[in-house]
Amino acid sequence: LFLPGLMGAAILQVNILISRLLAYSLDESAVSVLYLASRLMELPLGVFTIAVATVFFPLLAKALSNHDETAFSSAFLQGFRLVVGISVPAGIGLFVLGEPIIELLFLWGAFEKADVLATVPLVAIYGIGLPLYSAATFATRGLHASKDMRTPVRVAGYCLLINLFLGLLLMQFWGAAGLAAANVLAALAQSWLLWRALSARRPGISCHALRPALSKVLLAGAIMGLFCALAWSFLAGFGLNEKLSSALVVSVCVPGGATVYFILLYLLRFEELATLKAMFLSHFAKR
């Protein structure tokens, strides 16, 4: 059971690896920018989404061992709301602030402004895909808790083929950005297929139950993104050099955007706000 479970959970890494191999047929810079963009996306995925999945997995398994479908559905939906509440603003942040983040982290030595501009579209694409990767990760844990190892593996196989086909096709038109887009479209297919399989197995899990939370998160995330874009535009007018300007933008927009987001979730009465806030505070308290 370990190897099938590993394959089902690791399809994201496999698809990104395939995209990197395909990128070698473009040019060396395509490999580099694809690697950097995917690593930026994997940071919030690994720090927050996988942490939520790890915490909720034993709760899901315990509920099923007690034959308590209601407890399973309740725990899964709570965890999924947390995953959405984390991944959506993180993805919007990458989409809006990709350029200053890349400049701050990587604009050193041989990595020049042209490389930054080549990486920005890929970071934006992966930012769009982050909620999909997160949804697929958590849905996989839900199926594993149900002792269903075959479905994630079967879905992973389908998505590997989707990613390969779309990668070969889209790279002809958009280069490295096409490879990133293929990853995201494969993640869309994976998250939809896994959710469909889990909801068929567990009737208590439905999209209808998540609509209120998803609407609140999308609204708060959109306003947060607008705040970040306006703040970046304002701070860019200070006339600082690229490095100082990007450091100022990131240091203001990231905590400022998070504050705006949490205030909006509070006003919208998002169900898991207290848990979400505790996760952020505990993570940054360790830093």
Q: What kind of region is each of these model predictions?
A:
Residues 1-287:
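Membrane-embedded alpha-helical bundles of multi-pass transporters/translocases
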